[in-house]
């Protein structure tokens, strides 16, 4: 025959290499029996072998095995069989994957491929070996004791391959949290140093002084092209959302099963669905629990359900009787099924920008890709929209790698296009539904207001400025600031207006004056909380006004407003609908009119203070405040409370300035000596700053002068005493000694006189009058 048999390490593993010879199954025979069968075979000799492509390192075990045939006996060389025998064993399977068992695979019929594909030195094989993708991963450890969580391994069955591979990534480790290193990756460099064997890799990774470790890993590029990364799948499936899962699952279960050649439908009922009820089709979203599966989405409520599709999609094509646990893998459920099942009910006409040809081509490419990936090239029939059921032609003259590259390129292009189209469609539908909901809400409020008898009108509480907006340059009176939301405080004590108006709801509008925020009050069904959403579309408002607020009612028809978090801020206050009419008072308090009859004609000016029952309305205890947007020096904005008094004073100052300016051209008549001068707020600030600086300057001068005098006193010597002063001091000392001797007090000296030195004689007192 011109070739030698390969030697397997274990004779009982012979079935892993050679499957059939001239249609006779050899998987259960020993090596000697296989050799005898080869010798006894007649020409032409057709041998079916099992080979694993070397470019699928690191892939899951369900893709490591591919079934190929040789054309004639001279196309298989000894070197090729030896290379197949030296391939490393498959990597450990993932937790949710089951390895293929050859006995569970469907029977293999003869296939003929290009013999040049199996030559060891062929250009395609060399090209495949070089199709590697390199990625640099940097892992950071918090301390030296932390482990990366990588189990490195090397090959023992091939001396030429000295590469270091990642055998396992421990869950909840640093490498697993990073997510870029996967099982089967080859480690090329560690911290910029090439590693040749396992000892070098372990030595570098276990160094205690290294906390940041940079790894250069390589993996087959086709592995990344065949399967989506988890991040890409999540990003793509986020566009569809979880709301279409129920519709997608029902659509897949309703699709008719696909016919299949062979007896691989064993164990599955004829005509029934390909999967049991307990098994769920994986659409790539990753939802497994019932609570998430039954969850409803707001977008699903708005967009509505699409009609179920009866077109065969890859979601239904997957169910061709393979019910064994060995075939229940994540990669077997192709991720693009969600896209096709979603668009199957739409058709190419409902996707603007995607023609019918592109749509059908996209489906066909995905189906081909699914079948090629999972080794099910034979016996698969799929339906096309243009021409019913037709068999998939698998006798291709071009190589599998070239075909897969073309498929990947076209799939990426169409996938990107479909993603953008579907995203734009969903956004457009969402906008339309929101617009309809807003219009229905507004119409219901208008109808509610029109149906009620119009007993009275309650205007919003606002302040009439002293001047019109067009004549004022105040920041408080500009168009935008007048629309600022007023402060909401506790309602007024119950009045006849409120008692008579209970149960009635009106739309409060201000027919004139500056625009103010309106509070919508409706009457929903009793016992149910009012929860709705209002979308502001007034271009003059310039900002979104409010979202929803829960209004809970007690049995005594009392209204409690519940605010959570930032909703308590009046800057973010909301529209209210209540069963009773609620009264608000804003920046400036406005008391209710005298009677209900005078409500429409009551004066709203600040000068005429309304009275109730002849008694003036009670003033607000707390100072009236309002919200104002302030700007910091760095340009950022913040909201602060400011008393209304500041705004009134500023408006008064502007009015005074306008009255005093431009009256005459006589400089003497408008001089500050006669008219006085009004200092603005900025000028008063400058005055305070200058006064503070002058006071500091005076204090500094006084302190300097005192220090100077103190230095002069300490530096000069004691001055010499004058002789006259010394004589005077001595005389006074003698005199005092005579008068105040023996502790004679002044009173005694004045009353009784002075004693003599010996104490025997007493002189006349000083106050006695004598004549000479």
UniProtKB/Swiss-Prot annotation:
Residue positions, PTM Phosphoserine: 242, 459
GO cellular component: cell cortex
Pfam families noted in UniProt: PDZ (PF00595)
Keywords: Coiled coil, Cytoplasm, Phosphoprotein
TM ranges: none
Domain of life: Eukaryota
Parts forming coiled coils: 394-424
The PDZ domain, residue ranges: 136-221
Disordered: annotated segments: 239-320, 450-573
Protein's cellular compartments: Cytoplasm, Cell cortex
Family annotation (InterPro entries): E3_ubiquitin-PDZ_ligase, PDZ, PDZ_sf
Ranges of biased composition (kind: Polar residues): 473-484, 502-511
Compositional bias ranges of the Basic and acidic residues kind: 287-303, 452-472, 535-552
Stored SUPFAM superfamilies: PDZ domain-like
SMART domains in the cross-refs: PDZ
Name of the protein this chain belongs to: PDZ domain-containing protein 4
Naturally occurring in which organism (per UniProt): Mus musculus
